[in-house]
Amino acid sequence: MLRATFTGSSYVGVFARAIDDLLLVRPDVDEELADALGEELGAEPLLTTVGGANTVGSLATGNENGVLVSARATEREQSRIAEAADCEVGELPGEINAAGNVVLANDYGAYVHPDLPRESIVTIRETLGVPVVRGDLGDVRTVGTAAVANNTGVLCHPKSTESELQAVEEALDVRADLGTINYGAPLIGSGLIATDEGYVVGEDTTGPELGRIEETLGFID
């Protein structure tokens, strides 16, 4: 476990994204912090922007099969990411294309923004190599901000309904539970980065919140 901030912000999930053994991180991060993040998550840091923006956690996501980025990502950015990840990089088309915000994925499935068009669903399925299900969590359509998943569990927005939890469990083939980060913040994805190896969370996250993260995502022996 690592508590962290990016330039004073506890919303670490906005500025970094762990995808299998690759960690995309905003390019102005301190090298020592980047190394600490990578060590905790079992991932190799790649300092990059997506579409020229530092909010790489909001604009990219993926799993062991591929990386999905916003349509705003440049060819150079996509090429660097593809080389580092050694897998396919897909570009999420359409108006709703902040991939990290609108796609919640692990190695078993993807749970996505309910308004994504068919073209986007096809791209997600082909890039990530998993079934894709539309839905929301706690009436939040940007499901990538509302939850964080690994291959053990998915921690969801505290107002997620029982039917939403059941839907995301079926989509990702893992157990779901409710939680918060950063002293009660409901948008889990904005303040938590997780892999199967470890997790990084915003500095303001409390002990009870850490306990729920560890229980849900499988970090308690």
Curated annotation (Swiss-Prot):
UniProtKB keywords: Initiation factor, Protein biosynthesis
Gene3D superfamilies: L-arginine/glycine Amidinotransferase, Chain A
Translocase as UniProt keyword: no
Gene Ontology terms: biological process: cytosolic ribosome assembly
Keyword Chloroplast: no
Molecular function per GO: ribosome binding; translation initiation factor activity
NCBIfam families with a match to the protein in the record: eIF-6, PRK04046.1-4
Family according to the record: Belongs to the eIF-6 family.
Summary of the function given for this chain in its UniProt record: Binds to the 50S ribosomal subunit and prevents its association with the 30S ribosomal subunit to form the 70S initiation complex.
Protein name, as recorded: Translation initiation factor 6
UniProt organism field: Halorubrum lacusprofundi (strain ATCC 49239 / DSM 5036 / JCM 8891 / ACAM 34)
